Structures are given as C-alpha cells and as structure tokens.
C-alpha cells in the first residue's frame, strides 16, 4: 500500500539584486537549540489537533467543489509547505497564512509554530525498518536571485530544505529539473508535478511525502475477486475486491453519525481508519468532520472479531491547484500584488503564482509474511468476541495517521475505486 503526495509553490516577480543579511525578529540560534530538544507530548498533541483542523477544513472545501469525485491529499504536505513560506512572510501576509493553517496567534508564537513543525518533520524522517516514509522540502531558485541568508538557514534547519539553482529563462529545462527531483523522491510515483512554468517564475518550493505501508495482516491475493462497488443507489461498477476472514481488529459503530469506523494497522507506527457512512449519509459525516470527531473515533474503537472484511483494491490519483481553494480558508494575500514576502529576498517584489498539489493512493493486498501470524494477537485470547461482516462496497473515507507523532498524514475519499 503506497500513498504519495507532492506540492509545488511557484513564486513570480521582478528579479531583484539583494545582498544577504540577517533578520533578528526571533533568534535563529535560540530556535535551532530548542528544535534539537525533544518536543513535549502536549506540544505534539496541540500541533496534531491544529493540523487535523486544517485537514478537515481543506477537505470540506475540496468535497464541496467536487462532491462526487475521489479526493486524495496530504494535509501535512500542504501545511508544512505553507508554514515554510510563512518564514519569509511579514505583516498581514504572515497572519493570513498562519491563521489559515488554524493557528491562534494570541496563544501560539510564530517561533513555537516553526519549532513544532521542525520537530514533527524530524521525527518522521527518522529511519525505521518497518515504516517507509520519505518527507522533505526543496527550493529551486532563479540563478540570478539572491535570497536572505536568514531565510535560507531557517528553511534548512527547521524544514530540512534542500536548495538548488535553476534557470527559469529556460522553462523546459527548469521544469524537467524539478519534475525529475520529485519523481526520484517519490519512487517514480509522481512524474510530472509541474506542467508549465510562468515566464516570471523566480522560485519554486516543493514539498513531497512518500509513504509505503505494509499491512500488519496482509490480504491473500488468491482471495481477491471481482465484485460490485455501489457508486450510489442506482449505479455500480465492477472492482477487484480484497477479502479477509477472521480478522481481530478495532471497530466502532457511530450511531450518532450513521457510520462505521474500522482500523487497519501497518507494521511500524502508521495506522489507517476506514470510515464507512451508511447509504446516503456521506454528506452528514463530511459535515461533522472536526478534530473532536476524530478523537472520539480513536477513543471509541473496541477490539472486535471481524468474520469477513471486504475492501476494494484500487489506485487513484488527484491533482489540485490550491490557488482556487486556499483563499476560501483566508489565505489570499500571497497571491496578490499586496503580498509581503520580503523575508525571502528583502523586497516586496515576490508573490505566489501557483500552488500545485498531486497525490497518489495505492491500496493492495501486500503485507509482510510474518504479520498474519502476529497481527491476530491483541491480548484478548481468553474472551469470545461476536463476529461481524464489514463490506466497503460503497463510498468511504480513509485517514492515515502516524501514531508516533499523532498526526494525520493523508486523507482520502473513495467514491469510485475503478
């Protein structure tokens, strides 16, 4: 099972010549020292809750624009990229970005926000044998553009950002340079993040995240069969349906929201929640998506014995120009002539021309060979549990979280898995 996302922020403007100098709005030395220390559980929970709030707000805007379409995106990829841009923003531009990300600036300082993201990215970048997560940022800078040393150092130290020069006067070559980089970082899953560059492009910021998870208990490919997936009450399509018998996992029936919630774990620190609304109740569930809803689901999950589980095998991809969506979350000024990104170059000649996000979700039977033997053991061996059948044969939601840092990595809505 793989989930890959990439985001590109294209900046355009008049190419200034700027000498590199320092900005002392908050001390980089102090911030970097704090970032090297371990974050507290409270810090982690606060950032996780805020990121979830942003994720659901963004999801609702996407769903409103395309109610019957598949949705796949990484809220973490988008929020991390916007937070990175905010390092160079000032005044109202800065406030719009951070408030659009759902931060309360009277309660959380700018320095604490960046420290939180830095710690989160650091934790996710730690090598783990069982998780395959590759997350990072890159800046592609016009060869004649000089950016401030302070901005460059903060992006490197806090957001693990690589910096490259590019000749945007040669747009074909520059586009290939960026797309080849993203393709390499996402194992070839996203080959064309950028389709074309504006002739005034001065900088492209890229965030990518690649996740390949193995089910703790894998589906047997020999059990996969062709079955109906009901798009609505009148239409259906044939899809490959995976099947598993006698699975012990956590489940919750939410009568208030008329949906069922099932957890499937990956090896390592990742876990997926599958949310199956009752027929005709998808919009009700979507409208109720809040951080509190997700917390309720996690706390309410109880171990159950699933007699039969049916889950479609699918691969879906989406791409978005978030310039059409972010203003609805209050992030407007970065796209206008009033944008103040002077913390990047020292002048106000820079604005964002495009925010492109692409994501790919691939769900299949794959799991580790030993997982099927150990995954059934959850400490309930002496208790008899009532079995049930769960069929994901109609539109459903999927939330992938990293339990180690308690944050939402990806969200998806599967309306048509074919």
UniProtKB/Swiss-Prot annotation:
Glycosylated residues in this chain: 104, 184, 269
Pfam families, A to Z: Serpin (PF00079)
Tissue distribution: Expressed in liver and testis.
Example of a GO cellular component annotation carried by this entry: extracellular space
Cell compartment(s), UniProt: Secreted
Segments of this protein annotated with the region RCL: 367-392
Annotated site (Reactive bond): 381-382
SUPFAM superfamilies linked: Serpins
One MF annotation (Gene Ontology) recorded for this entry: serine-type endopeptidase inhibitor activity
Record GO biological process: response to cytokine; response to peptide hormone
Domain of life: Eukaryota
Transmembrane segments: none
Keyword Signal: yes
Disulfide-bond pairs as recorded: none
UniProt xrefs under InterPro entries: Serpin_CS, Serpin_dom, Serpin_fam, Serpin_sf, Serpin_sf_1, Serpin_sf_2
Region forming the signal peptide: 1-20
Keyword annotations of the record: Glycoprotein, Protease inhibitor, Secreted, Serine protease inhibitor, Signal
Record comment regarding domains: The reactive center loop (RCL) extends out from the body of the protein and directs binding to the target protease. The protease cleaves the serpin at the reactive site within the RCL, establishing a covalent linkage between the serpin reactive site and the protease. The resulting inactive serpin-protease complex is highly stable. Variability within the reactive center loop (RCL) sequences of Serpina3 paralogs may determine target protease specificity.
Additional note from the record: The single human alpha1-antichymotrypsin gene (SERPINA3) is represented by a cluster of 14 individual murine paralogs.
UniProt record similarity statement: Belongs to the serpin family.
Stated name of the protein: Serine protease inhibitor A3M
Organism of this sequence: Mus musculus (Mouse)
Lineage, top ranks: Eukaryota, Metazoa, Chordata, Craniata, Vertebrata
Gene name per UniProt: Serpina3m
